[in-house]
Amino acid sequence: MNTQIIQLEDTKLEVNNLNFHYGDFHALKNINMRIAKHKVTAFIGPSGCGKSTLLRSFNRIFELYPNQYATGEIKLDGENLLTSPMDISLIRAKVGMVFQKPTPFPMSIYDNVAFGIRLFEKLSKADLNDRVEWALSKAALWNEVKDKLNQSGDSLSGGQQQRLCIARGIAIKPEVLLLDEPCSALDPISTAKIEELISELKHDYTVVMVTHNMQQAARCSDYTAFMYLGELIEFDETAKIFDKPRLQRTEDYIKGRMG
């Protein structure tokens, strides 16, 4: 049941026999899947099903916490990220992440976006300015903040802060962008802007998102994975998952007959 290999034109991430443990708790069980390049893939399922755990495995963010470990393979363009000798900061630069709650750094709007660029690249001031403008434009925020770049990121609204975090994430030009319930703390208007942005971002990045909002998954994603109790139950094109799922358990969840 946890092997969901669908035919893709171009695979960006390949997950093979992935297991994850929180101490003695077996949170992910033999996950196998392929994530399509330049598409949006959504993970859905009830709370505690493992969707955020799976997402956070992709850039090894779990290593920041004790007694958590993953086994198996998560391959980015063929390289297993779980065993790669690459510096972990470079892995997280390639596989960026935006969290559920907007987390602007305690610094100016400009410095929030420039922060990662300064860590990984040596750019002239002019090139840095261009990159900051580019990232804010990509995040559909430039026109709203271009005259107040020196103001604190905390001065922005919640929706603007989340777009600032997305700008910060894409400023270092990752290959994959992970979004962990990016709209759950936002109002409907801000949510609509983020959803529109997600649809644009896939032209440049491979986007993987976790959402509790099934309508959001249906609107934004190209592929959807349904998870339950640490298992990958069904994974297919989003239209197929929502219109004609293969499994009864998937249909029950989609139609609200299970929590």
Swiss-Prot record:
Top-rank EC class of the record's enzyme: translocase
EC number annotated for this UniProt entry: 7.3.2.1
Keywords: ATP-binding, Cell inner membrane, Cell membrane, Membrane, Nucleotide-binding, Phosphate transport, Translocase, Transport
Record: residues binding ATP: G45, P46, S47, G48, C49, G50, K51, S52
Topological type in the membrane: Peripheral membrane protein
SMART domains assigned: AAA
Stored PROSITE patterns: ABC_TRANSPORTER_1, ABC_TRANSPORTER_2, PSTB
This protein's record includes keyword Lipoprotein: no
Coiled coil spans: none
Entry protein name: Phosphate import ATP-binding protein PstB
Pfam families on file: ABC_tran
Protein origin, superkingdom: Bacteria
Subunit structure: The complex is composed of two ATP-binding proteins (PstB), two transmembrane proteins (PstC and PstA) and a solute-binding protein (PstS).
InterPro entries xref list: AAA+_ATPase, ABC_transporter-like_ATP-bd, ABC_transporter-like_CS, P-loop_NTPase, PstB-like
Compartments reported by the entry: Cell inner membrane
GO molecular function: ATP binding; ATP hydrolysis activity; ATPase-coupled phosphate ion transmembrane transporter activity
